[in-house]
Amino acid sequence: MSDSAYTLAELLIAAGSEAWRGDGEVLATGIGLIPRLAASLAMLSSSPDLMMTDSEAYLLSEPNPVGGRGADFRPQYETWMGFSRIFDNVWGGKRHAMVGPTQIDRFGQANISCIGDPAKPKAQMLGVRGFPGNSISHANSFFVPGHNTRVFKAGECDMVCSIGYNPARLPKGYAVAEIDIRLVVTDLCVMDFGGPAHQIRLRSLHPGITAAKVQENTSFPVCVPDDVITTPAPTEAQLAIIRRLDPHNLRSREIKDNPPGDRR
């Protein structure tokens, strides 16, 4: 555990990096700053065999830092990684993405497309993008910077972009056992879908957060085991890596007010 002060953003990056632990040589994709830093931290610590691109066309042997890098910065290019090779990994199941849905329901289905009736939405967002194919092809984890009942929605998502553990929504030929949702990292806790019948399950509570607060901010029942732990603080080594990867502290803008990671 770290003796240094750490922020909530840093706690979430360290917690998010655990999603890739033990993955081996798969393409790690973090969509958004916190997931990207989490994937980069994993590559530089617990999961050195991960593959990561520069978000353009090259595979890196070391993650690029975020923000301005200076004229003398030289990316650690390893080889070309164009779209054809990206999709070889996607369709072959050799990828693990962490994404940020706008809505998640009790099945683990996710939405980034629209809010309200899709025929007449209250708000139009990105569209389904790559969510349908990703959800049937490889492992996925979720990042939620603001855990509330609007995100963790009662019933089903307004638009199911990413399938989950709902047999009624599975494409022909797919089984629930083939769906692979790993971690759900929020500003309150870490969860997964390892409860009874793939119910969402609490894995750890961030320091100062209670299970009651998590349930209060989730519109469907959360499985709370007897052995829920406190989310581990980032280690000194992890904090050093995070601060090297994000020298301009862009992470502080990703979480509202970015409070201390320990809120006791």
Label each region the model flagged.
Residues M1-Q76:
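N-terminal active-site beta-alpha-beta segment that forms phosphate/nucleotide-binding
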Residues L8-L12, G16, G30, I34-L37, ...:
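General structural feature for long, well-ordered alpha-helical segments within catalytic domains
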Residues L11, G24-A28, C223-A233:
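Flexible, glycine/charged-enriched surface loops at secondary-structure junctions
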Residues E18, S40, N89, E216, ...:
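Charged/polar, solvent-exposed surface patches and flexible loops
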Residues E56-N64, F83-F87, R129-N134, R253-R264:
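Short, surface-exposed, charge-dense and proline/glycine-enriched linear segments
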Residues P65-P225, P234:
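Conserved phosphate- and dinucleotide-binding cores of soluble alpha/beta proteins
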